[in-house]
Curated annotation (Swiss-Prot):
This is DNA gyrase subunit B, novobiocin-sensitive. The record marks 494, 497 as: Interaction with DNA. It comes from Streptomyces niveus. It catalyses: ATP-dependent breakage, passage and rejoining of double-stranded DNA. It is an enzyme of class 5 (isomerase). Heterotetramer, composed of two GyrA and two GyrB chains. In the heterotetramer, GyrA contains the active site tyrosine that forms a transient covalent intermediate with DNA, while GyrB binds cofactors and catalyzes ATP hydrolysis. Its cofactor is Mg(2+); Mn(2+); Ca(2+). GO terms for molecular function: ATP binding; DNA binding; DNA negative supercoiling activity; metal ion binding. GO terms for biological process: DNA topological change; DNA-templated DNA replication; response to antibiotic. Keywords: Antibiotic resistance, ATP-binding, Cytoplasm, DNA-binding, Isomerase, Magnesium, Metal-binding, Nucleotide-binding, Topoisomerase. Mg(2+) 2 binds at residues 542, 544. It is found in: Cytoplasm.
Length: 684
């Protein structure tokens, strides 16, 4: 092995640009340096959002985003990610390889600069990528800084090059190895346990993100493999699309491969596969580009017979959770066009009001994916697109293509209009119902539901409300609460399955009315999160199947009609114990799972304790606990276990609720069979 501190700077080929392709040389001179890495280890949250599970997975996606940039530029079509047996992660792509030539301003190989200097990457300065999805250069250097060690291997300029790092610092110079005709980059890293609260990766979290990436990058193959011992026990019981890979003489490993030739058209088909009947059989596919402004848009859309809207937008493959100008252009074009068409074809008479945007989008599943040279992100989480040119471009393209599609498919267009009119009728009926109930005070927080045991504090940030199924459990909860800041709302039985009902019917449900008035925010178009009366909404149901069903019904309602509560982190699931282990009169412990029960019993026996066969009590429901037991195990802030409901991926959550609460029985059975062993918290 020859150790070269001054790698040969061969002249790379220059690719000229279609959309997303390289517009200049991708060599050492294309790597621009903006600032150092000093602060990353001191304040990691500023760069990756958190040092919890979400931040840990962000490391993986930052490295993968760099490989996706190569795919966007047309130079890579395969990305292979492996969770190693020792907890490391390896990301391999078949792109051109990070350049190894010397960066003039630094006097170091480009690969070392990219890995050790913040904001050093090929997307800055205009000489590298015309479209970039990740923080290219920022991400991989931050990953390096927050890892105990990193190994990089680059195949470029006819050789294989390697370099190793420890805590962000090179441990040796970039080494030139054997000759090779292949190209690509391999980054292997081990996250620092002194920085992160956990270094345990979730196969499901990564596979969901990679499936989304594969949908958004037509023709890209993304493979995820898990070589950890814990993965071998669940091979064959994984997420949809998971394969098990087995080499003769070796145990199978858990792996999944995603490849979608149809891109976002396949994404819409996937999301609509659980949505019941379709209003039109083919997905509407829009694809347009403005090369001069380095702007392109892909849209896939299809209406189904359900009542919820599922419009998801992306900019440079980044999920724009907060929407933005591309969504605004899409909505404006569609609302204007459908109303004009409905009047021209006499579906709407002169005296009729226009259809609202929400009427037209009822049952619509759509993916909007724009790619821009200089995306401007705004909003609280920097996931709202701000480019004004995106709105005008998308609005123009959608209007042109949708007008043409309606003219060529008059029967399907008529069905879409009829569904929109039905939605408008229901919306007006719901408005009248809201006005009526508002006059009666049923939806106003000023007239709280009679069964609500409210708390004394008026500070929402300190207040929490427990939604409890059944009056008996509600009675125990009321007695066991801290009345200063804990409120109790008992609900009777299972609330309405909102997945199968329109808003007018939903607002007639007594339990739904109680929830809306207790929370104080209003619902749907009247929703105002500033009026929320409790910053913790805690769903407290039995630990059995019925209890989980009730929680799922409640979560479906919150997701469909009060989604900002979930997005803002206000919704929690309580975790009541399953067992009480009695060692003696005043010596007992609680267990929250079968495994914990067995472990506590075994530990007790090792410590010389004895237990009778009838000394392990299984709680069948919250009503079996007295007020003191409920307080200690499930309500006391010092002892309880809560699971915060998070929303990392709205499209995946939409699909999950469609599976759990929709009409497709077989899809629901399949999901439960695959995931039954892993369900502890519903983390969506």
């Amino acid at each position: 092995m020859a150790d070269s501190g001054n790698p040969n700077e061969n002249t790379p080929s220059v690719a000229t640009g279609e959309n997303g392709e390289v517009t200049g040389s991708y060599n050492a001179s294309a790597i621009t340096v903006l600032e150092g890495l000093d602060a990353v280890r001191k304040r990691p949250g500023m760069y990756i959002g958190s040092t919890g599970e979400r931040g840990l997975h962000h490391l993986v996606t930052e490295v993968v985003d760099n490989s996706v940039d190569e795919a966007l530029a047309g130079h890579a079509d395969t990305i292979d990610v492996t969770i190693l047996a020792d907890g490391g992660v390896r990301v391999v792509d078949n792109g051109r390889g990070i350049p190894v030539g010397i960066v003039p301003s630094e006097g170091k190989p480009a690969v070392e600069v990219v890995l050790t200097v913040l904001h050093a990457g090929g997307k800055f300065g205009g000489g590298g990528y015309s479209v970039s999805g990740g923080l290219h250069g920022v991400g991989v250097s931050v990953v390096n800084a927050l890892s105990t060690k990193v190994a990089v291997e680059v195949k470029t300029d006819g050789y294989r090059w390697t370099q190793d790092y420890k805590l962000g610092v090179p441990t040796r110079r970039c080494a030139q190895n054997e000759a090779t005709d292949e190209t690509g980059t391999t980054v292997t890293f081990w996250a620092d346990p002194d920085v992160f609260e956990t270094t345990e990766y979730s196969f499901e979290t990564l596979s969901r993100r990679f499936q989304e990436m594969a949908f958004l990058n037509k023709g890209l193959t993304l493979k995820l493999t898990d070589e950890r011992e814990s993965a071998k026990a669940v091979v064959g019981a994984d997420v949809a699309g998971t394969d098990s890979a087995e080499t003769p003489g070796e145990e199978p490993v858990r792996s999944v491969t995603y490849y979608y030739e149809g891109g976002i058209v396949d994404f819409v088909k996937y999301l609509n596969s659980r949505k019941g009947d379709l209003i039109h059989p083919t997905v509407i596919d829009i694809d347009a580009e403005d090369k001069e402004r380095m702007l392109s848009v892909e849209i896939a859309m299809q209406w189904n017979s359900q009542y919820s809207e599922g419009v998801y937008s992306f900019a440079n493959t980044i999920h724009t959770h907060e929407g933005g100008t591309h969504e605004e252009g899409f909505r404006a074009a569609m609302t204007g066009l459908v109303n004009r068409y409905a009047r021209e074809k006499k579906f709407l008479r002169e005296k009729d009001d226009n259809l609202a945007g929400e009427d037209i989008r009822e049952g619509l599943t759509a993916i909007i994916s724009v790619k821009l040279g200089e995306p401007q992100f705004e909003g609280q989480t920097k996931t709202k697109l701000g480019n004004t040119e995106a709105k005008t471009f998308v609005q123009k393209i959608v209007h042109e293509h949708l007008t043409d599609w309606f003219d060529r498919h008059p029967n399907e267009a008529a069905d879409i209009i009829r569904k929109s009119i039905q939605a408008a009728t229901a919306r007006v009926a719901a408005r009248k119902a809201r006005d009526l109930t508002r006059r009666k005070g049923l939806l106003e927080s000023a007239s709280l539901p009679g069964k609500l045991s409210d708390c004394q504090s008026n500070d929402p940030s300190k207040c929490e409300i427990f939604i409890v199924e059944g009056d008996s459990a509600g009675g125990s909860a009321k007695s066991g609460r801290n009345p200063q800041y804990q409120a109790i709302l008992p609900i009777r039985g299972k609330i309405l399955n909102v997945e199968k009902a329109r808003i007018d019917k939903i607002l007639q449900n007594t339990e739904v009315q109680a929830l809306i008035s207790a929370f104080g925010t209003g619902v749907h178009e009247d929703f105002d999160i500033e009026k929320l009366r409790y910053h913790k909404i805690i769903l407290m149901a039995d630990a059995d199947v019925d209890g989980q069903h009730i929680n799922t019904l409640l979560l479906t309602f919150l997701f469909r009609f009060m989604r900002p509560l979930v997005e803002a982190g206000h919704v929690y699931l309580s975790r009541p114990p399953l067992y009480k282990i009695k060692w003696g009169r005043d010596d007992f412990e609680y267990a929250y799972s079968d495994r914990e029960r067995d472990a506590l019993v075994e530990l007790g026996k090792q410590n010389g304790k004895r237990i009778k066969e009838d000394s392990i009590q299984r709680f069948k429901g919250l009503g079996e606990m007295n007020a003191e037991e409920l307080r200690i195990t499930t309500m006391d802030v010092d002892h309880r276990v809560l699971g915060q409901v998070t929303l990392d991926d709205a499209a995946q959550a939409d699909d999950l609720f469609s599976v759990l609460m929709g009409e497709d029985v077989e899809a629901r059975r399949s999901f439960i069979q695959r995931n039954a062993k892993d369900v502890r918290f519903l983390d969506i």
